[in-house]
Amino acid sequence: MMAAGPRTSLLLAFALLCLPWTQVVGAFPAMSLSGLFANAVLRAQHLHQLAADTFKEFERTYIPEGQRYSIQNTQVAFCFSETIPAPTGKNEAQQKSDLELLRISLLLIQSWLGPLQFLSRVFTNSLVFGTSDRVYEKLKDLEEGILALMRELEDGTPRAGQILKQTYDKFDTNMRSDDALLKNYGLLSCFRKDLHKTETYLRVMKCRRFGEASCAF
């Protein structure tokens, strides 16, 4: 039987994950910096897992196994976020300051707000993104969390950062077109990669600030 302490912590974490940041901050005005980081990591993990599961389901359903490797090595799989100076892994991320990592994470998140806003109109059969109508809200929620962390680290006066002028294309609604399938496949691949980066950056920041045993990832 699960001990009362860990069980209570798990239930609290789940409850906070279901709340938007405005409610979290309102309910816990004195939330510590470690609490803000913990919630941001939790939300990023949830979105990354959702993106990974969706990519796998889309791939399994629409992309023949023999074509997957070749497609992933074409321009279709190129993510324009790779053109910004973002660390590609944990070791590179550790060379950046927390504010640099937060700004990069913000750029990655904001580049997807447009494409994901009407995602439920694309996958209307609920084959993938069963909760697609909430993906945009979850992404906005994470954006608010990152902005909250930036305000904390910048003493409430965030500086103007780099503006990502380009965003990803919208998902194609014509699922019977091979070109549309390839485009959506590439977008889902990029979404998964960008959420993995964001989760990695947030975990690196949280671990090096608070030195937790779970830092080995």
Swiss-Prot record:
Q: List the disulfide bonds.
A: 79-190, 207-215
For the modification Phosphoserine, which residues carry it? 132
Q: Where does Zn(2+) bind?
A: 46, 199
For the keyword Transferase, the answer is no
Question: Domain of life of the organism in this record?
Answer: Eukaryota
For this entry, list what GO says about its biological process.
animal organ development; cell population proliferation; growth hormone receptor signaling pathway; insulin secretion; negative regulation of apoptotic process; negative regulation of fatty acid biosynthetic process; negative regulation of gene expression; negative regulation of plasminogen activation
Give the UniProt entry's GO cellular component terms. extracellular space
Give compartment(s).
Answer: Secreted
An example molecular function term from Gene Ontology annotations: metal ion binding
Q: What keywords appear on the UniProt entry?
A: Disulfide bond, Hormone, Metal-binding, Phosphoprotein, Secreted, Signal, Zinc
Signal sequence segment: 1-26
Q: Which family does it belong to?
A: Belongs to the somatotropin/prolactin family.
Role noted for this protein = Plays an important role in growth control. Its major role in stimulating body growth is to stimulate the liver and other tissues to secrete IGF1. It stimulates both the differentiation and proliferation of myoblasts. It also stimulates amino acid uptake and protein synthesis in muscle and other tissues.
Q: What is this protein called?
A: Somatotropin
**Source species of the chain:** Bos taurus (Bovine)
Could you read off the lineage of the organism from its UniProt record? Eukaryota, Metazoa, Chordata, Craniata, Vertebrata
State the encoding gene. GH1
